[in-house]
């Protein structure tokens, strides 16, 4: 049978329960098909939107963009799953701007994200793509003054991007109207449909005036059974896009571990426990020629220990964690994106959604629990963005290897022991 490829005018099948797009799998025949295109011009996009697309360097659609844009333009619900860094944000932003009527001074597109950082990044992408269209975009998220959000909404934005708590609050105080929403986007949907956000998302959805007609688009790199169940409650005859490349393996990212064997037998505190990992990390930094990297560790307390230790050893780095204010986190991200600091220490805020150009190496100083296994995929997905090559290094103790190997088996991926003569070049 015919397979989905990245060539122009490929087709995918539609089933009674929805349309399913899977790369590298045979397609079953059916009566209706969704067409994918190889160039932006083939979509019949607005001229000013095309100008915005080319102005930010989007030369051709990525595979997820080919698969997702047309169904949204055609009015379909979608649930999309694709590896990190493949252009999911661009997919829903382009489609949303195409269907948005800029002559109407009402909010038509609502995008929810789990953190302010991701929401801000999404809002910036809408602004960049819609810069020639007169698109008005409002960012609503915790950490910013309510008064500023009211001012933003008074400008009658076409598109609102925000975090669930702040969006729900602005709806409750009658500052954000749900009367004209035509597209509801849930980004990082696996996180948004978990218990922490699920009720807020459902509450916001219930407030949409025409919820029986509104389109819903869900995007994520991973989904668990619970999130899939919840999605089925609100999606109608959706297009299911599954582009995970062999059960979640992140294409282009080489994964390794360094086994430090036993953890320190005698220790006075967390720094003593982490010391062998810190020494190993520092040794790599000194001996290898690396660009910018991110170092992930689970807790904000441990992130502070790693940061302080590296600073004491005169290694230039930045720290981002929940202990910082929102303004401090934004300044840190902007400095790092601007080239300040060789590495960024993160307690997990950046494991989802954040795009940092020219990042090729991710270090993980611990292993997420198996229950939070998707965190591993999101962590290492910070490298190898948009088809570039990336490297992920897990620095672990012997007792952590069991969990790492369980994640390896679950995602049908390969995590090798780092060779002694390995070079990052």
Curated annotation (Swiss-Prot):
Compartments in which it is found: Cytoplasm
Protein function: ATP-dependent RNA helicase which is a subunit of the eIF4F complex involved in cap recognition and is required for mRNA binding to ribosome. In the current model of translation initiation, eIF4A unwinds RNA secondary structures in the 5'-UTR of mRNAs which is necessary to allow efficient binding of the small ribosomal subunit, and subsequent scanning for the initiator codon.
One Pfam family it belongs to: Helicase_C
Catalytic activity: ATP + H2O = ADP + phosphate + H(+)
EC number(s) reported in the record: 3.6.4.13
Domain of life of the native organism: Eukaryota
Family as reported in the entry's similarity comment: Belongs to the DEAD box helicase family. eIF4A subfamily.
Protein's recorded name: ATP-dependent RNA helicase eIF4A
EC primary class: hydrolase
Matching InterPro entries: DEAD/DEAH_box_helicase_dom, DEAD_box_RNA_helicase, Helicase_ATP-bd, Helicase_C-like, P-loop_NTPase, RNA-helicase_DEAD-box_CS, RNA_helicase_DEAD_Q_motif
Amino acids binding ATP: 82-89
Domain comment in the entry: The Q motif is unique to and characteristic of the DEAD box family of RNA helicases and controls ATP binding and hydrolysis.
Entries under PANTHER family matching the protein: ATP-DEPENDENT RNA HELICASE DBPA, ATP-DEPENDENT RNA HELICASE RHLE-RELATED
Motif Q motif: chain residues: 38-66
Organism name: Encephalitozoon cuniculi (strain GB-M1) (Microsporidian parasite)
Keywords: ATP-binding, Cytoplasm, Helicase, Hydrolase, Initiation factor, Nucleotide-binding, Protein biosynthesis, RNA-binding
């Amino acid at each position: 049978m015919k397979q989905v490829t990245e060539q122009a005018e490929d087709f995918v099948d539609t089933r009674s329960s929805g349309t399913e797009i899977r790369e590298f799998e045979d397609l079953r025949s059916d009566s209706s098909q969704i067409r994918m295109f190889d160039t932006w011009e083939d979509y019949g996009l607005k001229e000013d939107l095309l100008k915005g697309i080319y102005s930010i360097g989007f030369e051709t659609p990525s595979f997820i963009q080919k698969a997702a844009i047309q169904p949204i333009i055609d009015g379909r619900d979608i649930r999309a799953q694709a590896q990190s860094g493949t252009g999911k944000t661009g997919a829903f932003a382009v489609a949303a701007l195409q269907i948005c009527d800029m002559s109407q001074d009402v909010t038509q597109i609502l995008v929810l994200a789990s953190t302010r950082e991701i929401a801000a990044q999404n809002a910036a992408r809408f602004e960049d793509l819609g810069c020639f269209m007169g698109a008005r975009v409002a960012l609503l998220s915790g950490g910013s003054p309510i008064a500023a959000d009211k001012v933003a909404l008074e400008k009658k934005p076409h598109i609102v991007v925000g975090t669930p708590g702040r969006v729900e609050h602005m709806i409750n105080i009658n500052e954000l109207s749900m009367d004209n929403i035509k597209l509801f986007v849930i980004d990082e949907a696996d996180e948004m449909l978990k218990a922490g956000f699920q009720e807020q998302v459902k509450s916001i959805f219930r407030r949409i005036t025409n919820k029986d007609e509104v389109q819903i688009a869900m995007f994520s790199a991973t989904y668990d059974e619970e999130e899939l169940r919840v999605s089925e409650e609100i999606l109608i005859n959706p297009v299911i896009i599954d582009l995970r490349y062999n059960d979640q393996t992140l294409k282009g990212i080489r994964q390794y571990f360094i086994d430090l064997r036993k953890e320190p037998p005698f220790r006075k505190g967390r720094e003593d426990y982490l010391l062998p990992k810190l020494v190993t990390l520092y040794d790599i930094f000194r001996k290898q020629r690396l660009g910018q990297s991110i170092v992930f560790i689970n807790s904000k307390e441990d992130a502070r220990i790693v940061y302080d230790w590296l600073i004491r050893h005169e290694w230039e780095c930045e720290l981002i964690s929940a202990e910082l204010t929102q303004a401090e986190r934004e300044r840190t991200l902007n400095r790092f994106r601007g080239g300040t600091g060789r590495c960024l220490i993160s307690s997990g805020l950046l494991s989802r959604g954040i795009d940092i150009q020219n990042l090729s190496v991710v270090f993980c100083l611990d292993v997420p629990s198996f229950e939070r296994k998707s965190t591993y995929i999101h962590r290492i997905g910070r490298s190898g963005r948009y088809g570039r090559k990336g490297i992920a290094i897990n620095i672990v103790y012997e007792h952590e290897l069991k969990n790492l190997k369980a994640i390896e088996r679950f995602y049908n991926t390969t995590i090798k022991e780092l060779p002694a003569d390995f070079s990052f070049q």
